[in-house]
């Protein structure tokens, strides 16, 4: 049985730490802590990798009892080359069914998240790189909003390259990091549901 693979997209290195473009990496690191994940550098994958076991507790339902092995991956390539870290792990369309990629999305307001499946990259370079590397769009993603919003909570998407760069390369404020930590609990539960009950159930419950 092939492992589940959860990927958190971002750029390696200190200068990118805490930036909005690193949202996937930040969230997967927080989720890893919940599982006492021990990260190790995998030179072959050019990534930080941790092995955990995920699943609902046995009491949730006898049928769902038991936990499944999951590989957490934080690519150490730059965003545009993320596929290099994923290609050796996802070798078929079938194995892509157990892949989830967590990443930042400018088309959604900060603090929101959505599970999607089998969609285009939407211009996200990291996602584009993974799609090219594994030759399929048929995998799950957790899109996490990073765009500013109006006082009424509507999306205020930046327009123009400079404005976009300013948002994605800007660092999260401490109060925004608290919002991400809260969001990580919801995403962690969604990932557990995905592993134990399948994608449809996770989408119905968390979207």
Regions inferred by a protein language model and the residue ranges of each:
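Conserved TIR/SEFIR loop-to-helix hotspot centered on a Trp-containing motif
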Residues: 121
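Nucleotide and nucleotide-moiety/phosphate-recognizing core
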Residues: 2-118, 128-143, 149-166, 170, ...
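Active-site YXXXK catalytic motif of short-chain dehydrogenase/reductase
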Residues: 124
């Amino acid at each position: 049985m092939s492992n589940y693979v959860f990927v958190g997209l971002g750029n390696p290195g200190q200068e990118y730490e805490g930036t909005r473009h690193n949202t996937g990496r930040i969230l997967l690191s927080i989720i890893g802590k919940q599982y006492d994940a021990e990260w190790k550098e995998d030179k072959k994958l050019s990534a930080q990798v941790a092995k955990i076991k995920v699943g609902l507790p046995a009491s949730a339902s006898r049928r769902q009892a038991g936990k499944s092995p999951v590989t957490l991956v934080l690519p150490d390539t730059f965003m545009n080359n993320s596929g290099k870290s994923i290609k050796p792990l996802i070798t078929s369309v079938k194995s892509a069914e157990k892949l989830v990629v967590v990443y930042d999305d400018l088309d959604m307001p900060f603090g929101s998240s959505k599970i999607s499946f089998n969609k285009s990259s939407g211009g996200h370079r990291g996602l584009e790189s993974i799609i090219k590397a594994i030759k399929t769009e048929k995998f799950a993603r957790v899109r996490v909003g990073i765009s500013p919003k109006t006082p009424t909570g509507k999306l205020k998407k930046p327009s123009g390259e400079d404005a976009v760069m300013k948002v994605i390369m800007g660092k999260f404020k401490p109060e925004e990091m608290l919002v991400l930590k809260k969001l990580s609990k919801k995403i962690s539960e969604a990932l557990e549901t995905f592993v134990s009950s399948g994608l449809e159930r996770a989408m119905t419950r968390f979207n």
